[in-house]
From Swiss-Prot:
Xref: PANTHER family: CELL WALL-ASSOCIATED PROTEASE, SUBTILISIN-RELATED
Leader peptide range in chain numbering: 1-18
Family to which the UniProt record says this protein belongs: Belongs to the peptidase S8 family.
Ranges in the topological domain labelled Cytoplasmic: 1159-1342
Keywords associated with the record: Autocatalytic cleavage, Cell membrane, Cytoplasmic vesicle, Glycoprotein, Hydrolase, Membrane, Protease, Serine protease, Signal, Transmembrane, Transmembrane helix, Zymogen
Source organism: Plasmodium falciparum
Origin superkingdom: Eukaryota
Activity regulation field: Activation may be calcium-dependent. Inhibited by the non-covalent interaction with the cleaved propeptide.
Subcellular location per the Swiss-Prot or TrEMBL entry: Cell membrane; Cytoplasmic vesicle, Secretory vesicle, Microneme membrane
Region (Disordered): 85-111, 143-171, 415-474, 500-531
EC number: 3.4.21.62
Principal place of residence: membrane
Protein name: Subtilisin-like protease 2
Length: 1342
C-alpha cells in the first residue's frame, strides 16, 4: 500500500509541475508504465532487450572502470613506485657503497700510516730518552776500556786481547744492567704515556745496539726499526694505541663517516633511517616545501597540506587542491569530544576544493587509505606519566599493508583494554594466584569430612578450595536426581551445583548465595562482568548421562577450557596433560578390566583440551565417574577455566520442528545492543533528500530518455545469472549498487563457513572454495582432516546452499552470491542428520583462526547454553592481531522470542557476534523466524532463496540459515574494501557499519534491535568514504572534472571512539581519455582527536571556512547520481524520513485532487450548455404525488412573484419586497446559495402555467408580516407569533403537512401536462426573484 501511495504521489507531482502533460496522454501513460515497472521490480526476472549488447557493455564497463579497477590501479601504481624507488635506491646504494669503500680504504691507509708514524714517534721518543740518559754512563765505561787498550807493549798484545775479550764481556754485562736500570726508571716516570703498553724487550735491544754501534746507529737503527715495525705491526697488540683509536672513531662518528667497526647492514639501516626521518619531516612539514623527487617515471611533490604522486607533469600543472581546511599539516587535527550518546552523529564539517586549470578532462575517484587508531584508555591517568602525542605515535606498531591475511593466525591478548585486563584478573583467567573452588555434594560423606579432606588436599597460597554444602538443605536424593534427569532440567536455585572463581576477600559468592530467582544477575552465564559460572561434578555426570541417552556413541567428549595465554606445546604443559591422562587411565583400569587407554585432543591457539571418556558408566556406577572427574580436576585445576561435556547443535531450516537438546533454563539477559540507526546529521545526510524539495523537482524534470533508461542499462550489465532467476533477495539488500561501487570483493578476504560441508566440485563454488593444506597446528589426525577440511562432503545440502549464497561465482552459470570474488573455506562439523557436537564446532573455529578468516558463518545453534562454545566465541575477539573476527549467527526458526528463550551462539553477548532474522518478500519478518528486540540485530532475506546444492544442482530453501549468509556476504564486501585500502578493520566496527547503514523496516511491533534490513550499498559506500569516523556524500565517489571547473567536497566527522584516529584521503586522478596511461593520486592526511583527557584538548569549530559555490561547479556523474538518488526512489528503503515524505506527498496529492474537483465543478457550472442540461434534469416527468406537488408549488410561486413585482423585477424588488418584509427578515431567511438564473430572464411563463389564487399568496404574506415583528433568535428557533396577540404556532410535521394541504391550484391537470413538456419550460432569470424563491422554499420545507 505504501508503495502505491508513494508512486501515486510522485505521479501527481509530475502532473502538477508539467502542464503539457494535460495535452500529451501518451507521455503521461508512459510515465505510469515506468512507475508500474518500479512496482513490479521486486518480482521481476531480468531480461535483455538491447540489440548491440557487446558495444553497450563495453561502454558501460569503461564508464565504471575507475570504480571497478581503481584499487587495482592504485595498488599497481604503488607497486611500480616502490619498484622504481627500490631500483633507484639500489643503483644509488651501489654508487654510494663504491664511494664508501674507496673512502674506507683511503681512511684505513691514512689510519695505518698514522698508526705507524705515531708508534714510530713514540718509540723514538722513548729510545732517545733512554739513549740520552745512558750516553754519559756508557762514555765513562768506554773510556776505561779505551785506556786499557792503548797502554802496554806489543808483546803483551795477546794477553791484552784476551783481557779485552774478558772486559768486553764485563762491559756487555754492565751495559745490560745499565739499560735495564734505565728502563726500570722509565717505567716509574709518570710523564711517559702508555708506558705499560710498550715492548721493553724491543727497546732494550734497540738501545743496546745503538750504544754499541754509536757511529752507525742513527741511520741503520732507523731503517731497521721501520722494517721490523712494519713486519711486527700485524702481530703487535693494537691495544697499545687504544686512546688514539678512540679519538679517531669519535671524530669519524661526529663527521658521519662509517668506521671499520660498523657492519654493512648497520650502515644500510642507518642510511635508511636517515631517509625515513628526512621524508617524515618533509611530509609533516608546515613550511612551503616544494620538493620534487622523480624516481624514474614516478613524481612525488610535497605541498603544505597534501602530497601529489603521479607519473605525469600534466597532473601537477593542471590540478590544484585547497586542503587547508582539513589537513592535519595545516590545522593539526580536528578535536571532537567523545560522547557515548552522540558517537553516531557526524557533527563537524570541512571542505576540500579541487580545481582543474588545464585543458584536459579528468575522472576523479575518492577513497581513504592507511587508517590508524590509537586507544588512549588509561594512558593519561593521574598516576601515570603523561606523554605527548608524538611520543605515543612512535609507540604504535606500523602494520604491513600487504599480505594482511596470509600466514598462520593466532590469538593476541596484548591489545586488551585496561578494563578487560582487570576483569580477566578478577575472573581468574590470567591470575596464577586465583584458584577454582569446588562446591561438591558427596552423599556418602558428611559435610565436615568433606571440608577437612579437601582443605588438606588442595590449597594454594592464601586461596582455599572449599567443598561448600548447604547445611540447611539436604543433598538431592537419588530419586530426585533421576526425576530431574528424565525432565531434562536442573534447579536454578541450587547453589551447590556451581563452581565459581572467587578470591579470599571477595563477597560475590556470598551475594550469589543470598540471591534467588531469575532476577539475580549472577545466575546468568552471559554476564561477562560477573564471575565465571562453572558446572560442578554432579552436573557433568548429568550431562554424561543425558548425552548417553540421546547419542549412542562409544566415547563422549569432555572439553576443558584452558587459560588462553598458556602454551600447550611447552614441555611443562605436555607433562601436566600426560600425567593427568595417566592418572585417569590408572583409575579406569582399576575398575574396568575391558578398558584399554584414554585419548585426548588439544586445540591451539584457542586452548581447548578434549578428553574422550569411554561409555563405561551408567546410572548404577555414576559415583565412579564422579570420582574420576575429581581426579582429573585435581591434576588440571590450576590451568582450567571451565569444563563440560559436548553439546549438540542443529541447522536452522524452516522444516525443523523438534529441539533435540535439553532446555537449560536461563534468566533473560539484555543483549549487547548496537547503536541505533543514525548515520548522518540531517544537514549532511544522504537522507536529507527526503525533506528537500529539490530532489523532487529534479525527479519531476527528468525528461531525458537516457537518464530514464539508466536503471535498465545497469540491470543489463549485471551478471548473466541474474537474468535466469528471481533476484528479489539480492535486489532488496541493494547488492547491485554495491558491486558498482566496489566490485565483487577481494580474493584475499576469507569467509569460514562452519556447517555441513560443501560440494567442492560444484561449478558455482569451485572457483572460490579454498582447501587449506594439512598443518600440524590443526592438531588433528589425517582422517579427521579429511572429514572436516579436505573433503567436507555435504550429505544434507545445507552447507552447500549456505556457501552459494555467500560467494557463488559470477561465471554466467547458475546463480551468483552476494560476494562473488572472495575466498570460501568450508568446514564440516554437521553430520548427515543435520546435527553436530560442540567439540567439532570448536575444532572448526580453531581452523578458521589459524587460516586468518575474519568472517565466520554459523547457520546453526542450540537452546542449551554451552560454556565451552561461549569461551571459544569470546576468544574470536583476539584474532588478527587483536582486531577480532566476526561471527554471523542465525536466530532460529521456531517463531520464538530469543529474549525469553535464547538460542546459542546467536544470543552470546559479545560485540563481535551478530544475530540475523529472516524477512519475507513482503518486507515483514518471516513467520517462522525467531525474533527479539534485545537479542536479534538485523534482518536479511531468508524466504524462498535459490542457491546451490550438491551435484551441480540448485534448489530453493527457506530459513534463517539462508538469512545469515546474506549478512556474511555483505561483511565480506566491507572487508574487501578495507583490504583494498590497506588495513584490517575492527570486528565491532564492521558490525556497527552494517547496523547504521541498514534500511528501516516499517512494522507495527518492534521485533529486533533496529528493525532494519541489511544494506550492502550503504555499508560499502560508508566504508569506501571513511567509515564511521569520516564521511563524504555519495556523489563524490566518482565525478568528472572538466576544464576550468571546481568541485567543493564536503567532509563530515564524528567521534566514533575515544582516542586518536588518522587516515589519508586519497583522490585518484585519471584522464578521461581511456588510452592514456597518466595516473596520479593526491594524499591528504587527516587526524581526529576525541579523548578529552589529552593535554591542551580544545574542541574544534563545527564548521570550517566558508566557500561560495558558483556556476563553475563540476557536475555529478550521471550513472553514479542515479545510484545515489535511487535511495529516494527505491521502493524498498523504508526509513522514517521516507515514511514522513510519503505521508506528506499523499496528503498533497489528496489536496490536489480536491482542488481539481472543485475547479472542474465550477467550470462545469459556468458552461451554458451543461447548465441548461442540468436544469432540464431537475424536471422528471414521472414522479410520485409528493414530488409532483412540490414542483407545482415552485412554479406557482415563480408566477406569483412576476405578477406581484411586475415585469421589471430588478427595479421593483427592493421597493416592494424589502420594504414589506424588512432587511433583517431577508437575512434571517437567506439560508442557502442561490443558483444563477439570470440568463433565463427573457422567458415568459404566463402562457404555460395557470395563475394561482390570490388568496393563497395572501396567506403567505400575512405570515411573513407577523414574523417581521419578532427577533432573529426566535425566528431561527422555528417559532411563529400570530398578529398582535403573539399567539404561538407550532411548526411540527403535522402542522406543516396541514399547511401544505391549504394550497390549492386551478387547472391542475393542464399544469401537469405543461410540466411534462419540460423542454419548452423557461424560467425568468433574475437574482432577486431567485433569492426570494429560495427563501420561500426553505420556509415551506420547514
Amino acid at each position: 500500500m505504501l508503495n502505491i501511495i508513494y508512486v501515486v504521489s510522485l505521479i501527481l507531482i509530475k502532473f502538477i509541475f508539467y502542464k503539457e502533460c494535460n495535452n500529451n496522454n501518451n507521455y503521461y501513460l508512459s510515465n505510469i508504465e515506468l512507475y508500474n515497472y518500479k512496482l513490479r521490480k521486486r518480482n521481476r526476472i531480468l531480461n535483455n532487450n538491447i540489440n548491440d549488447r557487446k558495444s553497450f557493455l563495453s561502454d558501460l564497463e569503461q564508464n565504471y572502470k575507475p570504480l571497478f579497477d581503481i584499487y587495482e590501479l592504485s595498488a599497481n601504481f604503488e607497486k611500480r613506485r616502490k619498484e622504481l624507488e627500490k631500483k633507484t635506491k639500489g643503483e644509488e646504494n651501489e654508487i654510494e657503497k663504491k664511494k664508501e669503500n674507496d673512502l674506507e680504504e683511503k681512511k684505513e691507509n691514512e689510519i695505518e700510516k698514522k698508526k705507524e708514524n705515531d708508534l714510530e714517534k713514540e718509540y723514538n721518543d722513548v729510545i732517545n730518552l733512554l739513549e740520552l740518559s745512558l750516553s754519559s754512563e756508557y762514555k765513562e765505561l768506554n773510556a776505561d776500556v779505551s785506556n786499557n787498550d792503548n797502554s802496554g807493549h806489543e808483546e803483551n798484545n795477546k794477553h791484552k786481547l784476551n783481557k779485552k775479550n774478558s772486559s768486553n764481556y764485563k762491559n756487555d754485562k754492565s751495559l745490560d744492567e745499565l739499560i735495564k736500570g734505565a728502563i726500570l726508571k722509565l717505567k716509574q716516570n709518570p710523564n711517559i704515556k702508555n708506558k705499560n703498553m710498550l715492548d721493553y724487550d724491543k727497546i732494550f735491544k734497540i738501545i743496546k745496539e745503538k750504544l754499541i754501534n754509536k757511529n752507525l746507529a742513527s741511520n741503520k737503527i732507523k731503517g731497521g726499526d721501520n722494517e721490523k715495525l712494519k713486519e711486527e705491526k700485524k702481530q703487535s697488540d693494537i691495544s697499545t694505541n687504544v686512546e688514539v683509536k678512540k679519538d679517531i672513531i669519535n671524530d669519524q662518528l661526529n663527521k658521519g663517516i662509517p668506521t671499520k667497526i660498523e657492519n654493512k647492514d648497520d650502515m644500510i639501516n642507518k642510511e635508511s633511517n636517515k631517509e625515513d626521518i628526512t621524508n617524515e619531516g618533509k611530509s609533516n612539514s608546515l613550511n612551503n616545501l616544494n620538493t620534487l623527487n622523480n624516481d624514474g617515471n614516478i613524481i612525488t611533490k610535497v605541498y603544505d597540506h597534501y602530497t601529489i604522486v603521479t607519473n605525469s607533469n600534466d597532473i601537477l600543472n593542471d590540478i590544484s587542491i585547497d586542503a587547508s581546511d582539513i589537513s592535519k599539516n595545516s590545522i593539526g587535527g580536528i578535536n571532537i569530544p567523545f560522547n557515548e550518546n552522540d558517537n553516531s552523529s557526524f557533527t563537524h564539517q570541512r571542505y576540500i576544493v579541487l580545481s582543474n586549470n588545464g585543458e584536459k578532462k579528468y575522472k576523479i575517484v575518492l577513497m581513504t587509505k592507511n587508517p590508524k587508531f590509537m586507544d588512549m584508555d588509561g594512558i593519561y591517568d593521574e598516576e601515570e606519566k603523561k606523554e605527548s602525542l608524538i611520543e605515543l605515535n612512535q609507540k604504535v606498531n606500523k602494520e604491513e599493508n600487504t599480505n594482511l591475511y596470509d600466514g598462520t593466525g593466532t590469538l593476541y591478548y596484548g591489545k586488551k583494554s585496561k578494563k578487560e585486563k582487570e576483569n580477566t584478573q578478577q575472573k581468574g583467567g590470567n591470575n596464577p594466584n586465583v584458584d577454582i573452588n569446588i562446591l561438591n555434594n558427596n552423599n556418602n560423606n558428611n559435610n565436615n569430612n568433606n571440608n577437612n579432606s579437601n582443605n588438606n588436599s588442595n590449597s594454594m597460597n592464601d586461596e582455599e578450595i572449599n567443598y561448600n554444602n548447604n547445611n540447611n538443605k539436604e543433598s538431592p536424593s537419588m530419586f530426585r536426581r533421576f526425576i530431574n534427569f528424565l525432565s531434562f532440567s536442573g534447579n536454578e536455585n541450587e547453589t551447590e551445583d556451581t563452581l565459581i572463581y572467587h578470591n579470599k576477600n571477595d563477597n560475590s559468592y556470598k551475594n550469589k548465595k543470598e540471591g534467588t530467582g531469575k532476577n539475580n544477575d549472577n545466575n546468568d552465564p552471559n554476564n561477562n562482568n560477573n564471575k565465571k559460572i562453572l558446572l560442578n561434578v554432579d552436573k557433568l555426570v548429568d550431562q554424561y548421562l543425558l548425552n548417553l541417552k540421546n547419542n549412542h556413541t562409544s566415547k563422549q567428549e569432555l572439553i576443558l577450557v584452558l587459560k588462553g595465554e598458556l602454551d600447550l606445546h611447552s614441555k611443562n604443559m605436555k607433562n601436566v596433560i600426560n600425567n593427568a591422562k595417566k592418572n585417569l587411565e590408572k583409575y579406569f583400569k582399576e575398575h574396568f578390566k575391558e578398558f584399554d587407554k584414554i585419548s585426548y585432543d588439544i586445540s591451539t591457539p584457542i586452548n581447548f583440551l578434549c578428553i574422550f571418556i569411554p561409555t563405561l558408566f551408567d546410572m548404577n556406577n555414576m559415583d565412579l565417574l564422579k570420582q574420576a572427574l575429581l581426579i582429573l580436576h585435581n591434576d588440571l585445576h590450576e590451568y582450567v577455566e571451565n569444563w563440560s561435556f559436548s553439546s549438540t547443535y542443529h541447522t536452522y531450516e524452516a522444516d525443523y520442528i523438534k529441539e533435540q537438546d535439553s532446555v537449560y533454563d536461563r534468566s533473560p539477559k539484555k543483549k549487547y545492543i548496537k547503536a541505533s540507526k543514525k548515520l548522518y546529521n540531517n544537514k549532511y545526510s544522504f537522507l536529507n533528500k527526503f525533506l528537500n524539495i529539490e530532489p523532487l523537482i529534479l525527479f519531476a524534470k527528468k525528461l531525458n530518455s537516457k537518464r530514464s533508461n539508466i536503471e535498465k542499462e545497469i540491470l543489463n550489465f549485471l551478471p548473466k545469472e541474474l537474468r535466469d532467476y528471481s533476484t528479489w533477495n539480492l535486489s532488496i539488500i541493494r547488492v547491485f549498487n554495491a558491486w558498482f561501487l566496489a566490485g565483487y570483493g577481494n580474493k584475499n578476504v576469507k569467509v569460514c563457513v562452519v556447517d555441513s560441508g560443501a560440494d567442492i566440485k560444484h561449478v558455482d563454488l569451485n572457483g572460490n572454495l579454498y582447501i587449506p593444506e594439512y598443518n600440524e597446528k590443526y592438531e588433528m589426525t589425517q582422517d579427521f582432516y579429511n572429514f572436516m577440511v579436505k573433503n567436507p562432503t555435504d550429505a544434507s545440502g545445507h552447507g552447500t546452499h549456505v556457501t552459494g549464497i555467500i560467494g557463488g561465482v559470477a561465471n554466467d552459470l547458475g546463480v551468483v552470491g552476494v560476494a562473488p570474488n572472495i575466498t570460501l573455506i568450508s568446514l564440516r562439523f554437521i553430520d548427515g542428520k543435520k546435527y553436530g557436537g560442540s567439540f567439532h564446532a570448536i575444532k572448526a573455529l580453531n581452523v578458521c583462526i589459524l587460516n586468518k578468516a575474519p568472517i565466520i558463518n554459523a547457520s546453526w545453534g542450540s537452546s542449551h547454553f554451552d560454556v565451552n562454545l561461549h569461551l571459544a566465541v569470546e576468544r574470536l575477539k583476539y584474532t588478527l592481531n587483536g582486531k577480532g573476527s566476526v561471527l554471523i549467527a542465525a536466530s532460529g526458526n521456531k517463531s520464538n522470542d530469543n529474549d525469553i528463550s535464547p538460542l546459542y551462539p546467536a544470543t552470546f553477548t559479545f560485540p563481535h557476534v551478530y544475530s540475523v532474522a529472516s524477512i519475507s518478500r513482503n518486507f515483514e519478518i518471516s513467520p517462522f523466524s525467531n525474533y527479539g528486540h534485545k537479542s536479534v540485530h538485523i534482518l536479511a532475506p531468508g524466504h524462498h532463496i535459490y542457491s546451490t546444492i550438491p551435484n551441480n544442482s540448485y534448489k530453493i530453501f527457506t530459513g534463517t540459515s539462508m538469512a545469515a549468509p546474506h549478512v556474511c556476504g555483505v561483511s565480506a564486501l566491507v572487508y574487501s574494501v578495507c583490504y583494498n585500502q590497506g588495513f584490517i578493520p575492527q570486528a565491532e566496527e564492521v558490525l556497527d557499519i552494517l547496523t547504521r547503514t541498514s534500511i528501516k523496516i516499517i512494522s507495527t511491533k518492534k521485533r529486533t534491535i533496529n528493525d532494519s534490513l541489511v544494506n550492502a550499498e550503504g555499508a560499502v559506500l560508508t566504508t569506501l568514504l571513511g567509515g564511521l569516523w569520516m564521511q563524504m556524500d555519495c556523489y563524490f565517489v566518482k565525478f568528472n572534472l572538466e576544464k576550468g571547473k571546481k568541485k567543493h567536497i564536503p567532509v563530515v566527522f564524528s567521534a566514533y571512539k575515544k582516542g586518536v584516529y588518522e587516515t589519508d584521503i586519497v583522490i585518484a586522478i585519471i584522464p578521461i581519455d581511456g588510452k592514456s596511461k597518466i595516473y596520479g593520486e593526491i594524499h591528504i592526511p587527516i587526524k581526529i582527536v576525541t579523548d578529552v583527557n589529552i593535554p591542551n584538548f580544545q574542541e574544534s569549530p563545527r564548521r570550517g571556512k566558508n566557500y561560495t559555490i558558483d556556476s563553475n561547479e563540476a557536475q555529478h556523474d550521471e550513472v553514479l547520481s542515479y545510484i545515489c538518488e535511487n535511495a529516494l526512489y527505491n521502493l524498498y528503503e523504508y526509513d522514517s524520513h521516507y515514511l514522513l515524505a510519503s505521508v506528506i506527498l499523499f496528503f498533497l496529492a489528496l489536496l490536489s485532487i480536491f482542488v481539481g474537483m472543485i475547479y472542474m465543478k465550477s467550470r462545469k457550472h459556468s458552461d451554458k450548455k451543461c447548465s441548461k442540461n442540468l436544469m432540464k434534469s431537475n424536471y422528471i416527468p414521472e414522479m410520485d404525488d409528493g414530488m409532483e406537488e412540490t414542483q407545482q408549488l415552485q412554479q406557482e410561486r415563480r408566477q406569483y412573484f412576476r405578477e406581484l413585482f411586475g415585469e421589471n423585477l430588478e427595479k421593483n424588488y427592493d421597493q416592494h419586497f424589502v420594504q414589506d418584509f424588512g432587511q433583517d427578515f431577508r437575512q434571517d431567511f437567506k439560508l442557502g446559495s442561490t443558483p444563477d438564473l439570470k440568463q433565463y430572464s427573457d422567458i415568459d411563463l404566463q402562457n404555460k402555467i395557470q395563475q394561482p389564487e390570490r388568496k393563497t399568496v395572501k396567506i403567505i404574506i400575512n405570515n411573513f408580516e407577523d414574523r417581521k415583528k419578532e427577533t432573529k433568535r426566535r425566528l431561527l428557533k422555528g417559532l411563529n407569533y400570530d398578529g398582535e396577540n403573539a399567539k404561538k404556532h407550532d411548526f411540527t410535521n403535522e402542522s406543516i403537512s396541514n399547511s401544505r394541504k391549504n394550497f390549492k391550484f386551478s387547472n391542475n391537470t393542464e399544469m401537469k401536462k405543461n410540466t411534462i413538456k419540460s423542454e419548452d419550460v423557461k424560467i425568468a432569470s433574475d437574482d432577486n426573484v431567485n433569492k426570494a424563491m429560495n427563501q420561500l422554499d426553505d420556509m415551506f420545507m420547514k
